[in-house]
Curated annotation (Swiss-Prot):
Its main location: cytoplasm. The gene is popC. PROSITE patterns: SUBTILASE, SUBTILASE_HIS, SUBTILASE_SER. This is Subtilisin-like protease PopC. Disruption phenotype: Disruption mutant does not show any signs of fruiting body formation even after 120 hours of starvation. Sporulation is strongly reduced. The precursor protein p25 accumulates as in the wild type strain, but p17 is not detected.
């Protein structure tokens, strides 16, 4: 199987821009103006549907089609039936217990149209179908191979887990120093109410005591699009790894979270076994988040998204520089679409130390977060550096030995752990952003970003580490 993210070429232009390594060069980049046309770029899903690929598009996201295109589709479905291949409009369910190979032998592929981020994810099971699709679409669309793995910058250290002490007072009062403003905000009734917080991670243990009292909107994004006969369901959140549960606890845990009254929207996009994900899964996760945020009841509410994940610093073995750069630009467009939708993207800078910068933290659209301990010392692992004229990180957050929830054990015992990493610092800053958006919901995402940067507590220089504007605080 081959997977591609299809992006309209009309949204790509050549201009001088800082390159992926920080060098000035002429390269193809996704422009802000034409990126806004993505939502109506329906030629790709129309053509893929006509070729017999199965649709796995979110409900309500398919674009309208003309009568001519509808007749073309029906003709394609009839042809598929005559040749023994199940077309995309077939009502025949898959055989119970059928293997992936058996199922893919009955259809040429599948696709997921994502209008809110302006792209289509296509999976081709047969080379000749890919060739047909390229013949139909390659003049107008860039086929970006979904081959570069993303992963979260794993915690660099963790304390021994321990069961929750049920006699313990609110951890928010103990964990967050007065200087960061969180205790004062909570005392003033500013706790994140009315703000939507999106998390792209390994998931969340929705029955952990930190999260069980709230309704969490949750979506597991599978490697392959869901069958229309077995669509994705809204289920109780789960997390086999614990990383996402820890991140959610820092930002929004009811006992020790920075913003305990936000509404959580969690997309599980990272495999617990490999701690990796792909551009396509992250794209689907972002599309789902924007779909939730744009519902009529949510359309005027402020939102923040936390991304404790990133691309490797260099193309992995076997991945060309060109494919790597295309993946970067597609990811940058997704981050930009968050900002265009008035959603603030908060991104972990990475755990590779000074003079190293990863993506998406290096994108100017991201609010990149480095890590300090509770004494304001910069963590040795915190990534920092310069990409062209951009200095990363933008801001610092508490990211050393941060106490938060992890997944429950098989005996239903709830555990907490101390973990370190910029993965922990980012949700702290996301929580601070949620507090600002709670207090002033009419501020735009860019205005909230500026507020966080202007209110930061300056930090002393620490060797070659860069600390941006300083420690994020609420005041």
């Amino acid at each position: 199987m081959k997977s591609y993210l299809l992006v309209p070429k009309e949204s790509i232009e050549t201009q001088a821009r800082v390159g992926p390594r920080g060098t000035e060069q002429g390269e193809r980049v996704l422009s802000r103006t034409t990126a806004l046309r993505f939502a109506v770029a329906n030629k790709a899903p129309d053509a893929l549907f006509a070729l017999g690929l199965r649709s796995a598009t979110l409900p309500g996201a398919r674009p309208p089609v003309s009568g001519q295109e509808e007749r073309r589709r029906k003709g394609k479905g009839a042809k598929s039936a005559r040749t023994g291949t199940r077309g995309a409009d077939s009502s025949t369910p898959p055989m119970p217990g059928a293997t992936v190979a058996e199922q893919t032998g009955a259809e040429p592929g599948s696709y997921r149209y994502m209008p809110l981020i302006g792209a289509t994810m296509a999976h081709f099971y047969e080379d000749h179908t890919e060739k047909e699709a390229r013949g139909e679409l390659e003049r107008d669309f860039e086929f970006i191979p979904d081959v570069v793995p993303l992963s979260f910058p794993g915690p660099v250290s963790a304390g021994q887990p321990g069961p929750r002490n049920r006699g313990m007072s609110s951890l928010a009062e103990r964990e967050w120093p007065d200087e960061c403003g969180v205790p004062l905000a909570h005392a003033q009734g500013i706790r994140g109410a009315g703000v939507m917080l999106g998390i792209l991670d390994t998931g969340v243990d929705a029955d952990h005591p930190e999260h069980a009292a709230r309704v969490i909107q949750f979506r597991y994004v599978s490697l392959f699009p869901n069958s229309p006969h077995n669509p994705a369901r809204d289920i109780r959140g789960f997390d086999p790894d614990g990383h996402g549960t820890h991140v959610c606890g820092i930002a929004a845990g009811v006992h020790h979270g920075v913003a305990p009254e936000v509404d959580l929207y969690v997309a599980s996009v990272i495999e617990s076994e490999t701690i990796r994900t792909s551009l396509g899964r992250v794209a689907a996760g972002m599309e789902w988040l924007l779909h939730q945020f744009s519902r009529p009841e949510n359309s005027t509410r402020p939102a923040v998204v936390n991304l404790s994940l990133g691309f490797p610093l260099m193309p992995p073995p076997g991945i060309s520089e060109a494919d790597y750069n295309l993946n970067l630009r597609a990811l940058q467009t997704m981050i930009r679409r968050l900002l265009d939708s008035n959603v603030l993207p908060v991104v972990a800078a990475g755990n590779s130390g000074p003079d190293t910068v990863g993506y998406p933290a290096a994108f100017p659209e991201s609010l990149a977060v480095g890590a300090v301990d509770f004494e304001r010392n910069v963590a040795t692992f915190s990534a920092s550096g310069t990409v062209g004229r951009r200095v990363v990180p933008d801001i610092m957050g508490y990211g050393v030995n941060v106490y938060s929830s992890t997944e429950r054990r098989c005996n239903n015992q709830a555990f907490y752990e101390r973990m370190s990493g910029t993965s922990m610092a980012a949700p702290y800053v996301a929580g601070i952003a949620a507090l600002y958006r709670c207090r002033a919901p009419d501020l735009t995402a860019l205005e909230v970003r500026d507020l966080i940067l202007s209110n930061a507590v300056k930090l002393p220089r620490s060797g070659t580490h860069k600390t941006g504007k300083g420690l994020a605080v609420f005041r």
